Amino acid sequence: AATQSNIGRMKAAGVNVAIGMIDDNDERQAQLSMQYAGNLVALGKVPGATGLSWNDAFAAITSKPADIVGMGAEIGSLRVGRRGDVVIWDGDPLELTSAVEKVWIDGVAQSLETRQTRLRARYTTPQEGALPKAFDR
């Protein structure tokens, strides 16, 4: 039967396991890989279930995918001389309530500003004239 415990069973049997998304929305759904990994950590605490340790779950979304596609010597972990994209979180990256604080891609800091963050800043504490005309009173 297909259960979430299967990935824990495969890991226990010595299989290199990785968690990833395979579809046309990879960029938008990348966060789901972290959520699945976090779920597997929680599953390990359920009696009778087989999940992953935190370290194994994190490796399943970082170094193991790189190893599986033959790029483990170049990417997937932070080592001198390797290419790397780095994300700094405000908490546990496998926890849904954690948020990204900083991102570097190929060593270049990335802006985290989006349309949503600009709107939040604009309307959280609106200045004179910031609200659309419909909101004038």
Describe the residue ranges of each PLM region.
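His/Asp/Glu-enriched, well-ordered alpha-helical/loop segment
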Residues: 1-89, 109
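Metal-coordinating catalytic core of metallo-dependent amide/deamination hydrolases
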Residues: 23-26, 121-132
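Extracytoplasmic and endomembrane cell-envelope/extracellular-matrix remodeling and assembly machinery
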Residues: 1-3, 117-122, 135-137
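Short, surface-exposed, polar/charged, turn-prone segments marking secondary-structure boundaries
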Residues: 14, 46-51, 114-118, 130-133
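C-terminal recognition in membrane/secretory proteostasis and scaffolding
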Residues: 93, 130-137
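Glutamate identity and glutamate-enriched acidic tracts
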Residues: 18, 27, 74, 95, ...
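C-terminal cap of metal-dependent C-N hydrolases
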Residues: 67, 79-123
